[in-house]
Amino acid sequence: HPAAATSFVMAAVAENGKHAAPNGNGKNGHADPNADAVPPADGLQLARRTGVHAARFALGGILTALFLRRAKFLNLHRGTTPYEAASRVVSVVHATVASIRSLQLAHARGGLKSPFTLFDPWLSGAQGSAPNTAEESEVFAFSSGYWIADLLYLLGYERDPLFVLHHVLTLTIWPQSMASGRGAAVPTLACALGEASTPFLGLWWLAKRAGNTTLEAPLSNAFTASFLPLRVGLLPMYALAFLRAAFSGKLDAVLGAARARLWAVLIAAAGAGSLVWAKALVAGFLKAQKSVKA
């Protein structure tokens, strides 16, 4: 059942949250640079937790697909649709949890003082350059587990090149941050910007495939309204600022020169992918509006 799969994944987050120490707070309520730092030695433990999350996401997807195969009243039971729909249900769960938690963690680091510090990545400041906290690493393990499970699904069923590249990108940055215990500001903000519109995309896909015209149009509008400013506006702006900071040497002390430049190029690639996707999205949106008027 989709609700059961959602509860299943949420329980995983709650269980792993028990192991994470709360963020330390400074005088202004932001993260203490020295609080709850995760040493690189904990990388093996985080890898195990990532694997557990991946297994839970995969199991949740399988259970959801089995339910949809039998729940003919939802009109998502034909052919490979149950598997594709289950992937969207799990995606909605992950994106909702990860984007909200990432936004909270970005705020804890002081990253929301200015407009997402778009023109000066806050990694160069004291708050941003502080070691990763246990809570941040738990969220990274949660997201990495999802991307591993979904990547296996994509390779087996849909094989969408854009999404495969997206998952490879994230599975480069997120685990590196967990293993090194540094640079949490980058995946935190990237996830907050990149995943916030995903729930609308998943729900729109489900409504469209099920033939629910009542929900399809408003969900499409909600996705477009959230995707364009976040993924076409803010994310490319942040990627450009991150590129400048990385190649100017400002982030060398935090991430190391090679890692800073690698992450900057990957974030820029994500921004470019968003622009390509947006072009197709806007074209489809305008086409749909013309058909409605006709």
Regions found by a protein language model. Give the residues of each.
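Membrane-helix and juxtamembrane interface regions of eukaryotic multi-pass membrane proteins
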Residues: 11-18, 23, 27-193, 198-201, ...
